[in-house]
């Protein structure tokens, strides 16, 4: 009985998410953010003339540039 209880306790601890982490979209797939990263962002930038580049992911603070979006819920930056 003790073994069963101990096994159940170990499985519970392993499967339990001990801290909430934000999930954000990246250009290809999803990204689980680090605990300190509290925001998702989506930003369009022009590295070269007439060639927009989309950047997406987790961030510590919201970008302030033009054509950027910042949010703080799971998968909100699609």
UniProtKB/Swiss-Prot annotation:
UniProt lineage: Eukaryota, Metazoa, Chordata, Craniata, Vertebrata
Entries under CDD domains matching the protein: TFP_snake_toxin
Residues the record marks as site: Key residue for inhibition of muscle alpha-1-beta-1-delta-epsilon (CHRNA1-CHRNB1-CHRND-CHRNE) nAChR: 44
Protein name according to UniProt: Short neurotoxin OH-5
Site (Important residue for inhibition of muscle alpha-1-beta-1-delta-epsilon (CHRNA1-CHRNB1-CHRND-CHRNE) nAChR): 45, 47
Organism of derivation: Ophiophagus hannah
Cellular localisation: Secreted
Protein function: This three-finger toxin binds and inhibits the nicotinic acetylcholine receptor (nAChR).
One GO cellular component term: extracellular region
Coiled coil ranges: none
Site (Key residue for inhibition of muscle alpha-1-beta-1-delta-epsilon (CHRNA1-CHRNB1-CHRND-CHRNE) and important residue for inhibition of neuronal alpha-3-beta-2/CHRNA3-CHRNB2 nAChR) residue list: 48
SUPFAM superfamilies named among the record's database cross-references: Snake toxin-like (SSF57302)
Gene3D superfamilies: CD59
Gene Ontology MF term list: acetylcholine receptor inhibitor activity; ion channel regulator activity; toxin activity
């Amino acid at each position: 009985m003790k073994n069963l209880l101990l096994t159940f306790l170990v499985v519970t601890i392993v499967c339990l998410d001990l801290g909430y982490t934000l999930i954000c979209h990246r250009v290809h797939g999803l990204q689980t953010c680090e605990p300190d990263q509290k925001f998702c962002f989506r930003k369009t930038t022009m590295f070269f003339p007439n060639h927009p580049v989309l950047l997406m992911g987790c961030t510590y603070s919201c970008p302030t540039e033009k054509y950027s979006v910042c949010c703080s819920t799971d998968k909100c930056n699609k």
